[in-house]
């Protein structure tokens, strides 16, 4: 895509494929979220999907639930074959906090082993695993204590992140702390259409700040390690393109 105007905005009406030049070594990949593909989760989104609006209608259209989703938890080997057939070399997936730590302080080793097995299967297929530590979902115990509304709760996310890192560091070199914090904040605390369904701009700002603090603390906890230089740690951003009424694109 080319910038077509002096100001920084895109002309979405045309993508000039011939003008796109990806550098040598550019890594093509695909990504998923645990709740959206694994199935059988028990988190804030599971609760949200089972809830109702004030008028008694289902929170989700038609009362739909993710339920088993596409059963990636059990069919990941088939999915890896599809990824390989697509021709990409990187797969970013999130680890489901509610499965790994269903009760505060109690870690399920079988869930951790599942993600080890996933990483091993990816590497055997020549695909680089990239792990996202938080992709919109919280275990219910964390949600019930206010999740990222309270800065004091960040320590639980850091503890979880360190446990996962120690378990998967032999297989994963690229780590993402939080997926799209602006989406989590705007949809859950500004628009109120995602859990926890609040519409409070001031609280939204506080949550956004705490997510960035959480990212920083996890980054520091992982990079301060003696082997920290061997790992890349970043955050996943979402970009909202905004066009003013006076500069609408034709």
Per-region residue spans from a language model:
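Catalytic domains of carbohydrate-active enzymes, especially glycoside hydrolases
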Residues: 75-96
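Short N-terminal amphipathic alpha-helix/helix-capping patch enriched in small hydrophobics
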Residues: 22-26, 72, 76-79
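Glycine-rich, proline-tolerant flexible connector loops at the mouths of alpha/beta enzymes
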Residues: 95-107
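Short, conserved clusters of charged catalytic residues that mark active-site
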Residues: 68, 75-78, 159-160, 217
